[in-house]
């Protein structure tokens, strides 16, 4: 099974950045790819998603989410709830193993296959194998520096890559 992803989203004021590392790991010991892109812009560039979990599953869910965004006119929360409901109820989708972070100019959401759509209390959220490390680093940087969201997200992933063996420092960042 493919694994090993770290995604972090950081919001400050009217800016949000979502960053992901580039490592794809097969099993527990083989790195297959160093430069995978796990961050995508959807809905005419107005929404950023980052995904963690099985690569094929994450891509499938990202495509489904894009369909929901189109169906609901770019309404992030509505599209997320509809995706989560379909994900939980559909016999095939229910078996997919992935998490999504989705962000637009107003909201940041975590979407899971168990039907949860969570808006974090803090303006930072992390997922994947190094997600907790990246989230902790991003929170510290957000509250103790004047760095912008892109710099915070990038530095948080750099820190996570020094701790988590499934995370590398080939980082992609998208900002709204």
Swiss-Prot record:
Organism domain of life: Bacteria
Activity regulation details: Allosterically activated by HslU binding.
Keyword rRNA-binding among record annotations: no
InterPro entries: ATP-dep_Prtase_HsIV_su, Ntn_hydrolases_N, Proteasome_sua/b, Proteasome_suB-type
EC number(s) given by UniProt: 3.4.25.2
Compartments (UniProt record): Cytoplasm
Assembly, per entry: A double ring-shaped homohexamer of HslV is capped on each side by a ring-shaped HslU homohexamer. The assembly of the HslU/HslV complex is dependent on binding of ATP.
Family from the record: Belongs to the peptidase T1B family. HslV subfamily.
Protein name stated in the entry: ATP-dependent protease subunit HslV
Organism: Caldanaerobacter subterraneus subsp. tengcongensis (strain DSM 15242 / JCM 11007 / NBRC 100824 / MB4) (Thermoanaerobacter tengcongensis)
Organism taxonomic ancestry: Bacteria, Bacillati, Bacillota, Clostridia, Thermoanaerobacterales
Protein encoded by which gene: hslV
